[in-house]
From Swiss-Prot:
Residues 1-76 are annotated as: Disordered. The lineage of its organism: Eukaryota, Metazoa, Chordata, Craniata, Vertebrata. Binds MBD1. Binds SSBP1. One of its GO terms (cellular component) is nucleus. This is DNA-3-methyladenine glycosylase.
Length: 317
């Protein structure tokens, strides 16, 4: 009879996580395989020891209360805000996005952005910072002067359309079109709720160096490009419908925020004249996940901001 042929299985790149590897079947990387089975068997003493350990764990789980089971689970395997998938709120429909940019930017605070990966994993983050762009009259907007190009087409599509663009040749930013031609809302920061370890892996895969300290939770999504990396967002999401897409959508936030919204000037805008100082950025006060904190704005608009209309805030210089 012929001798069995042993081969070494290479590691294949995982489609959902660039830089990570996916191993064929259940075989270990670099293990020898004959036909469809791994060579070698587990030593009997080790097998008995593992069996005893499994039995002990099973008995322990039977004695635990639901609360104890959740607290003893290593890592954040599911959102702390939902006890089951059935408890999750329905996605927001197209009518929700049909609002003026400023109104929509404020309404986004507290809502939950969801990203479903190719393997079914769902990542969730609560929106804590946004920025409104008002369209042709806005000198800081890509649509200033009514300019339409293939790049910014999403800004002129129906409300709820994603507008994704590249900056510095390597980072992406995620916007949502609103009511009004050329108007949109930039999503600037999220509070990670579910899938934190996956977010961390996605961020690490795109970092220049993964050697050194691990990213803290508050560093995962505290910036426009960071949240795109953490949720595996790329240019392929441009012009998708946030109300209909199967890989990305918005849900009602599970918790009402007790913190007021801070109204501040846009961040990171250089050459847009007076529009660099327009109070068109909104964030949840006290949130550690916000990208840029404006202490002056917090003192200026709290608590009297609730008595101001959005229009009054926009025209203020």
């Amino acid at each position: 009879s012929k001798e069995p042929v042993s081969v070494v299985l290479p590691d294949a790149e995982h489609p959902a996580f660039p830089g990570r590897t996916r191993r064929p079947g259940n075989a270990r990387a670099g293990s020898q395989v004959t036909g469809s089975r791994e060579v070698g068997q587990m030593p009997a003493p080790l097998s008995r020891k593992i069996g005893q350990k499994k039995q002990q764990l099973a008995q322990s789980e039977q004695q635990q209360t639901p609360k104890e089971k959740l607290s003893s689970t290593p890592g954040l395997l599911r959102s702390i805000y939902f006890s089951s998938p059935e408890d999750r709120p329905a996605r927001l429909g197209p009518e929700y996005f049909d609002q003026p940019a400023v109104t929509l930017a404020r309404a986004f605070l507290g809502q939950v952005l969801v990203r479903r990966l190719a393997d079914g994993t769902e990542l969730r983050g609560r929106i804590v910072e946004t920025e409104a762009y008002l369209g042709p009259e806005d000198e800081a907007a890509h649509s200033r002067g009514g300019r339409q190009t293939p790049r910014n087409r999403g800004m002129f599509m129906k409300p709820g359309t994603l507008y994704v663009y590249l900056i510095y040749g390597m980072y992406f930013c995620l916007n949502v079109s609103s009511q009004g031609a050329g108007a949109c809302v930039l999503l600037r920061a999220l509070e990670p709720l579910e899938g934190l370890e996956t977010m961390r892996q996605l961020r690490n895969s795109l970092r220049k160096s993964t050697v050194g300290r691990s990213l803290k939770d508050r560093e995962l999504c505290n910036g426009p490009s960071k949240l795109c990396q953490a949720l595996a967002r790329s240019k392929s999401f441009d012009q998708r419908d946030l109300a209909q897409d199967e890989a990305v959508w918005l849900e009602h936030g599970p918790l009402e925020s007790s913190s007021p919204a801070v109204v501040a000037a846009a961040a990171g805008i250089g050459h847009a004249g007076e529009w660099t100082q327009k109070p068109l950025r909104f964030y949840v006060q006290g949130s550690p996940w916000v990208s840029v904190v404006d202490r002056v704005a917090e003192q200026m608009y709290q608590p009297q901001q609730t008595a101001c209309s959005d229009x009054a805030l926009i025209v203020q210089k």
